[in-house]
Regions:
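Conserved ABC ATPase "signature" region
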Residues: 110-128, 181
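ABC ATPase NBD coupling module
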Residues: 65-80, 104, 227-228
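Conserved ABC ATPase "signature" C-loop
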Residues: 212-213
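Conserved catalytic motifs of ABC-family nucleotide-binding domains
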Residues: 154
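Helix-to-loop junction immediately C-terminal to a conserved catalytic motif
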Residues: 48
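ABC ATPase "signature
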Residues: 218-219
Length: 251
């Protein structure tokens, strides 16, 4: 679905992403893992065409990702994107946030209602919450609304930027299970950003561990644990292991 060929990105003098070439597996969940500022979200925005590459190119279905106009909009209709923190419009209700793109594309009311009902069932969202504004929803409910909005057009790809960030541990644990079930049920290509090692291992078919704009190691969590390629990988894993007599921590 996606292929990156020598893609890089700078913000002024800061090299956010060094030249990177990789292919993302279709129908699988790839997790971008690493500490804050390592380039995870930058890479996700490049995949969605929200940022232009400084060098190289991003291929989508074997063709260069368009950079503007109707061609880019057409690709984005096939790519569901959920921003960190949900990115919901505060002046719209939950239902209005979810159905915004469908209304812009002039879907029929019947088609919109049918799709919305299926998403409410899929995400286990309380239907009475659809009439509420984001400020009236819990953190977990806002994340479910953001996920439904990303799925509204039945995209081929899901790009999720820290979908479980800033949630309390119990809600986070519940949503992790729901996300894994949803990914398995839908069989879509998913690219998910997180800094949490356990979450990456639980949700990902493959992990790209990043540091300072580079992919340091790629593989399943068991591969990273058993065969770390350098001291950074070892330290990153160890930093997220539970402390003796404690509940664990995060890098």
């Amino acid at each position: 679905m996606y292929e990156l060929q020598d893609v890089s990105k700078c913000f002024g003098a800061m090299q956010a992403l060094h030249p990177l070439s990789l292919r993302l597996s279709t129908g699988r969940t790839t997790v971008l893992l690493g500490p804050s500022g390592c380039g995870k979200s930058t890479l996700l925005r490049l995949l969605n065409g929200l940022l232009p590459c400084d060098t190289g190119r991003v291929l989508f279905d074997g063709k260069p990702l368009p950079t503007e106009g109707a061609a880019l909009r057409s690709v984005r209709h096939r790519v569901g994107y959920a921003l960190q923190g949900g990115g919901l419009f505060p002046h719209l209700t939950g239902e209005e946030n979810v159905t915004l793109m469908a209304r812009q594309l002039r879907w029929s009311a019947a088609r919109t209602r049918e799709r919305l009902a299926s998403l409410v069932e899929l995400t286990r969202f309380p239907s009475d919450g659809l009439a509420r504004y984001p400020s009236q929803l819990s953190g977990g409910q806002r994340q479910r609304v953001a996920l439904m909005r990303a799925l509204m057009l039945d995209p081929d790809v899901l790009l999720l930027d820290e979908p479980l960030g800033a949630l309390d541990p119990l809600v986070r644990h519940e949503l992790q299970g729901d996300l894994r079930d949803i990914f398995a049920r839908l069989g879509k290509t998913v690219v998910l950003v997180t800094h949490d090692l356990a979450e990456a291992g639980f949700l990902g078919d493959s992990i790209l561990l990043m540091r300072e704009g580079r992919v340091v190691q790629q593989g399943r969590l068991a591969d990273l644990e058993a065969r770390p390629v350098d001291d950074f990988v070892t330290r990153f894993i160890q930093a997220q292991r539970p402390l003796p007599g404690g509940t664990g921590g995060e890098a």
